[in-house]
Amino acid sequence: MKHRDSIEDLYRQYYQEILNYLFRRTHHLETAKDLAQDTFVKALNGLASFRGHSSIRTWLYTIAHHTFINWYRRDVKYQFTEISKNEGLTQTTYDQPEQYLSRTVKSETLRQELLKLKDQHQSVLILREFQELSYEEIAEILGWSLSKVNTTLHRARLELKKNMTKSREEERI
């Protein structure tokens, strides 16, 4: 009974966070839900062997990351899908329609430019900037050294900034 309680607690505590991460990686809510479910099934099967060398949160992100990579290699291969305006995971209210429009345009531009980055750059940016994980957690999840996380994150930010600047310049023309 204790084992079942612990996986239910993990699910309640981390499901939304893992789902958000997978949604940002897949850009498709139903796929993200399926991968999140797979992540927790794998966690359930591996919970007895969890040794505590990392936090539970980092361990779940590692499982989610590998689940995403396996799905991507198997099913996607550069297939891009559109996000429906109604598929968002959170709802925000705005005082003025202009605020909503401005935020939507910026968000869509960011999403489009993020998709243009290499997979490694996407991974490290999403884990750091959107999921707000520490550099150490990212290194553990991706199986990288701390210096590789720092270097890749720096390069990813520069590339994203360059792409965003170029995109803004093209919009002005």
UniProtKB/Swiss-Prot annotation:
Keywords: DNA-binding, Sigma factor, Transcription, Transcription regulation
InterPro entries: RNA_pol_sigma-70-like (IPR039425), RNA_pol_sigma-70_dom (IPR014284), RNA_pol_sigma-M_bacilli (IPR014296), RNA_pol_sigma70_r2 (IPR007627), RNA_pol_sigma70_r4_t2 (IPR013249), RNA_pol_sigma_r2 (IPR013325), RNA_pol_sigma_r3/r4-like (IPR013324), WH-like_DNA-bd_sf (IPR036388)
Any one biological process term the GO annotation gives: regulation of DNA-templated transcription
MF (Gene Ontology): DNA binding; sigma factor activity
Top-level taxon in the UniProt lineage: Bacteria
Induction notes from the record: By hydrogen peroxide.
Pfam families to which the protein is assigned, alphabetical: Sigma70_r2, Sigma70_r4_2
Positions of disulphide bridges: none
PANTHER family, alphabetized: ECF RNA POLYMERASE SIGMA FACTOR SIGL (PTHR43133:SF52), RNA POLYMERASE ECF-TYPE SIGMA FACTO (PTHR43133)
Summary of the function given for this chain in its UniProt record: Sigma factors are initiation factors that promote the attachment of RNA polymerase to specific initiation sites and are then released. This sigma factor contributes to oxidative stress resistance.
Further comment found in the protein's record: The interaction between YlaC and YlaD may be regulated by the redox state of YlaD.
Family designation: Belongs to the sigma-70 factor family. ECF subfamily.
NCBIfam families in alphabetical order: SigM_subfam, sigma70-ECF
Record-given protein name: RNA polymerase sigma factor YlaC
Organism annotation: Bacillus subtilis (strain 168)
Lineage summary: Bacteria, Bacillati, Bacillota, Bacilli, Bacillales
